[in-house]
């Protein structure tokens, strides 16, 4: 006769303790890394190339946007994103026919030294003159 009552009392005590366990605990909310914007500019001559380095401080999305190609925004150039290995920019993503507003997007799995390379793909000639470019890179 007392067993069902005892079990019920034990069950109520266990439920009360379980409900109390979460009280006062602050849930862990992941923080998003601060996004850094780097702007790189340069002037491409025939067969020319430039490498720009930047530091990524956390995992996350890396986006490079070819924001300007002058004097003719329709002319193609090449640009790539990669990692720095020693003194070399090892391309991971590349567009060999990029025009103004083209975007490269990747994900940094770890922080470290990354690079952007901008290069002539045959569009810059002595007749066209040098091309001035601007690339914006957003990264954690």
Q: Language model features by range: what are they?
A:
Residues 1-20:
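Sec-dependent bacterial lipoprotein signal peptides
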Residues 22-35, 52, 77-87, 113-140:
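C-terminal edge strands of extracellular/lumenal beta-sandwich accessory domains
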Residues 36-72, 78-82:
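Non-catalytic, beta-strand-enriched accessory regions in extracellular/secretory proteins
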Residues 51-61, 105-112, 138-140:
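Extracellular and analogous surface-interaction loops
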Residues 85-96:
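Extracellular beta-sheet repeat scaffolds used for adhesion and glycan interaction
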Residues 95-109:
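Beta-sandwich interaction modules
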């Amino acid at each position: 006769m007392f067993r069902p009552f005892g079990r019920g009392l034990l069950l109520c005590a266990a439920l009360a303790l379980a409900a109390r366990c979460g009280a006062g605990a602050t849930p862990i909310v992941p923080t998003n890394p601060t996004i850094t914007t780097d702007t790189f500019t340069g002037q491409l001559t025939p067969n020319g190339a430039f490498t720009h380095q930047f530091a990524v401080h956390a995992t996350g999305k890396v986006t490079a946007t070819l924001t300007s190609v002058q004097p003719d925004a329709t002319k193609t150039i090449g640009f790539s994103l990669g990692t720095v290995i020693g003194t070399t920019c090892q391309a991971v993503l590349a567009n060999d026919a990029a025009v103004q507003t083209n975007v490269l997007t990747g994900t940094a799995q770890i922080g470290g030294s990354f690079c952007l390379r901008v290069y002539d793909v045959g569009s810059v000639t002595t007749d066209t003159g040098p091309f001035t470019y601007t690339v914006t890179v957003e990264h954690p």
